[in-house]
Amino acid sequence: MKMAAPTANKAASLGCNNKPAFPELDFRSGARVEELNKLIQEFTKHDQREYDDQRALEIHTAKDFIFSMLGMVQKLDQKLPVANEYLLLSGGVREGVVDLDLDELNVYARGTDYDMDFTLLVPALKLHDRNQPVTLDMRHSALCHSWLSLRLFDEGTISKWKDCCTIVDHINGATNYFFSPTKVADWFYDSISIVLSEIQKKPQRGMPKVEKVEKNGTIISIILGVGSSRMLYDIVPVVSFKGWPAVAQSWLMENHFWDGKITEEEVISGFYLVPACSYKGKKDNEWRLSFARSEVQLKKCISSSLMQAYQACKAIIIKLLSRPKAISPYHLRSMMLWACDRLPANYLAQEDYAAHFLLGLIDDLQHCLVNKMCPNYFIPQCNMLEHLSEETVMLHARKLSSVRSDPAEHLRTAIEHVKAANRLTLELQRRGSTTSIPSPQSDGGDPNQPDDRLAKKLQQLVTENPGKSISVFINPDDVTRPHFRIDDKFF
């Protein structure tokens, strides 16, 4: 898909060697490209949080609490797989790390409500056995969506999940069970609530404080207070698959920016069904295909300057285009991936081109709105903006036009917002208003608390892998051992 390219006017000397060159300007806004680059660098500096040893320990304590909670959920009714494989992503659902609808999500703000956010994909069904027949029924769904029939599963699985299915009786007397995203989410929220209630009856020293538990559509959002930090976990029940869906097979035949940088096996190692339906889909039955695991791999091939431009652009549009709901950060992420395919790698690798990339992303987004066309990166025949009204797309296109006319001012506003969020976080840390956790060296307390070696190990992982997504393998019968996979490395 062809999209608009960034507009920039290279310096010229008016044909006279003895005259100084003009500064490089953005043709549309007149902004100096050098100034835009500096503003993006300043935004990046304030947006990226540095973790000291205490913060690293708090991150691990929160993660361990969440995994322990999920282990107890599994033991409630044995529905979840005994040895499960979670995908932990840095950034919450509202940040666009997964293609989920944001309409039903409560608004949380960094600094006001939380300091760090994560998304955790938790397989309710883990279909990794290639001998397990699976029926993805796409006859009733829009592109990139599917129903999941349990008809070919064993009786034990059907019996276990029957209360989370919609049941369809056929004329021939056969009964079909369709795994219901809404019923699974209801069960998951109820189970988590029961477990948290039990945990809070027997509080242990150093245990995180559960500040908020809310069901946002099909997502369960938990905010934990740990030491001086508040951490938001958006927990999403999913169906996990190995391999690659047939509907996305043609995408593999095309040339892509990641060719030769990572292997095809890394990209197509698996996919998910996430609990979201299409605009006209049946909420109780329809799931959305998600390639979150593949996106973790693709992210490794994106230049730092393009990623900085993406983060700055996301910060600008996330509030500007929040009402009416039409554009999510995931749309912007898809456009960035298309840009990586479209543009030469050596162009995208230039460190001082963040301003050009930011302007290009704004142009691309406006182009997509005006044409009401944003193809899914993995299933291009799926237009993610198809359902929007002409009135909505033109409203947002006009808002983006104001950004494009003065990108520097909108960058300054984004910088002020992130600085204000950081000030709120620092103020909370000074007040020490959340539950304090003991230091690893302190005497007494729960013997299962992380020790100093674990804190140092976690700090090392965080330092060496800033912003990376983490896969976690966990056995609910043994949650005391770390089970990290950061990209393709195991720890």
Swiss-Prot record:
Residues 431-452 are annotated as: Disordered. It comes from the Eukaryota. Its EC number is 2.7.7.-. Residues 431-442 have a biased composition (Polar residues). InterPro entries: Mab-21-like_nuc_Trfase (IPR046903), Mab-21_HhH/H2TH-like (IPR046906), MAB21L/cGLR (IPR024810). Keywords: Nucleotidyltransferase, Phosphoprotein, Transferase. The modification Phosphoserine is found at S436, S439, S442. GO terms for molecular function: cadherin binding; nucleotidyltransferase activity; protein-containing complex binding. The modification Phosphothreonine is found at T435. The keyword Cell membrane does not apply. Gene3D superfamilies: 1.10.1410.40, 3.30.460.90. Pfam families: Mab-21 (PF03281), Mab-21_C (PF20266). It is an enzyme of class 2 (transferase). Signal peptide: none annotated. Probable nucleotidyltransferase that catalyzes the formation of cyclic dinucleotide second messenger in response to some unknown stimulus. Belongs to the mab-21 family. This is Nucleotidyltransferase MB21D2. It comes from Homo sapiens (Human).
